Amino acid sequence: MSIETGYRLTDNSRQLRRLFDERVRDLGLTGPQARLLLSLERYPNENQVFYAERLEIEPITLTRIVDRLDEAGWIERQSDPADRRARILHLTDKSRGIVTRLRASVEALFEDMLGGFDSAEREIFARMLERIADNLLAARQPEVAHG
């Protein structure tokens, strides 16, 4: 496999993020706000540190995003019983509608991305992505272990 494949994968990832950001803008959200809302739906009841790591952003950046979404009434912060300094994030009832529309927008984006792929190709592609994720995690393990 050539380095060209790696470049193509990186370029596709960048294009996907750009399209995602454009589509969620139509819902009145920034890309980071939308990613946080989707993460809150997928991984509920975690603290802000978890979401900052998941979204690969600095905690202070996440705090700004959380502040805006909290002001809009879409999320709420609660004290973490295990750590009084930490805050657990939750979606609010008000956010359910926007999250549903957001998920539909993302699903449409993925359909556009996979246009022309039949169901067998989509299944193979999904398995390949899982293997890539496993390989990347394994490659990172020595880094994590040795700091």
List the predicted regions and their residue ranges.
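Short helix-capping/turn signature of helix-turn-helix
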Residues: 40-43, 57, 132
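N-terminal leader segment of winged-helix/HTH proteins
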Residues: 1-27, 93, 143-147
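Key DNA-contact positions within bacterial/archaeal DNA-binding proteins
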Residues: 60
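Short alpha-helical elements of helix-turn-helix
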Residues: 3-7, 27-38, 63
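Pre-recognition alpha-helix immediately N-terminal to the DNA-recognition helix
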Residues: 8, 15, 19, 35-38, ...
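The alpha-helix within a helix-turn-helix
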Residues: 52
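Charged, amphipathic alpha-helical coiled-coil/dimerization segments
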Residues: 17, 45, 49, 67-130, ...
